[in-house]
UniProtKB/Swiss-Prot annotation:
InterPro entries: APOBEC/CMP_deaminase_Zn-bd (IPR016192), CMP_dCMP_dom (IPR002125), Cyd/dCyd_deaminase_Zn-bd (IPR013171), Cyt/Deoxycyt_deaminase (IPR050202), Cyt_deam_dimer (IPR006263), Cytidine_deaminase-like (IPR016193), Cytidine_deaminase_bacteria (IPR020797)
Upper classification of the organism: Bacteria, Pseudomonadati, Pseudomonadota, Gammaproteobacteria, Aeromonadales
Gene name of the record: cdd
Record note on cofactor: Binds 1 zinc ion.
PANTHER family found in the cross-reference section: CYTIDINE DEAMINASE
Cofactor: Zn(2+)
Name recorded for this polypeptide: Cytidine deaminase
């Protein structure tokens, strides 16, 4: 078990703690299957919403917030029935625009886990405007519920007179299946192959700047991030930030990155290269490897 979970575990009820412990091994990927959820519910007698609220301290324990010291956790419910942790992440010494919000982290975890939508997101603080706009891009934005410790409401109630993809004549949505197979690369390098697969599933209907980052760590594990664009532009989530957030949820230390690659479309209107290099520079001395295809 990752040591970050030790303290929040001690705050949980004895039945919940006992049921959780076998699930929080070194291979825990910050998600729970429907069978695991059923086990936790049976052990505690809690319903879905109450159980997610009880688990929030564990999600918040994944937070990396050296600037704000404000630790936020989120849990996204995938349409498959899986639950996905998310936590906010900040980069010490870097502009605040590099930050990843907890809701973005949980949604990214679900998207990278193969989900095509989420039905509900549980968070320990009211979503900020940035996150409300980010969630309004989702395939399930019209039906998405936001669960807070003292409230359960539709996302749309947080966004009266909302602006979204349809206002820019876009019929696609974040988390809808993507297949940008026009992106090709001849390489037998597993890291570049991972980046290519992720880039083909990225979402960039406004700039066509399909892109992904793949990070390899000292233990050999690879974590990817896809570009997630937004109708309001600024809430778009860059692939480097998503990859870092995904790795942290997986228990990695970003100081142990050994290789980092960025693959993006050469035909896009934008490039992630400068942003990715700046983020990576804040984490250590690894040089970004780059290809536009």
């Amino acid at each position: 078990m990752h040591p970050r979970f030790a303290k929040p575990l001690d705050t949980l009820s004895a039945p919940l703690k006992a049921a959780l412990l076998p699930m929080l091994g070194d291979d825990f990927q910050a998600r729970f299957t429907p069978d695991q959820v059923a086990t936790l519910k049976a052990a505690t007698g809690l319903d879905d919403r109450a159980l997610r609220l009880a688990l929030l301290p564990l999600a918040a324990a994944c937070s990396v917030a050296p600037i704000s010291k404000f630790f936020v956790g989120a849990i996204a419910c995938g349409l498959s029935g899986n639950w996905y942790f998310g936590a906010n992440m900040e980069f010490a010494g870097q502009g605040l625009f590099h930050s990843v919000h907890a809701e973005q982290s949980a949604i990214s975890n679900a998207w990278l886990g193969g989900e095509t939508g989420i039905s509900e997101i549980t968070v320990n603080y009211t979503p900020c405007g940035h996150c409300r706009q980010f969630m309004n891009e989702l395939s399930t934005a019209k039906i998405l519920k936001v669960s807070l410790p003292d409230d359960l409401s539709a996302l749309q109630s947080f966004l009266p007179h909302s602006f979204g993809p349809a206002d820019l004549d876009i019929t696609d949505a974040l988390m809808s299946p993507q297949a940008h197979d026009e992106l090709t690369l001849v390489s037998d390098d597993p890291l570049w192959q991972a980046a290519l697969a992720a880039a083909r599933q990225s979402y960039a209907p406004y700039s066509q700047g399909y892109a992904a980052v793949a990070l390899q760590f000292a233990d050999g594990r690879i974590f990817c991030g896809r570009y997630a664009e937004n109708a309001a532009f600024n809430p778009s989530l860059p692939p480097m930030q998503m990859a870092c957030a995904h790795a942290v949820l997986g228990g990695e230390d970003l100081a142990t990155i050994r290789r980092a690659v960025l693959l993006e479309s050469k035909d896009g209107q934008i490039s992630q290269q400068d942003s990715a290099r700046a983020t990576l520079k804040a984490l250590g001395s690894v040089e970004l490897e780059y290809q536009a295809v």
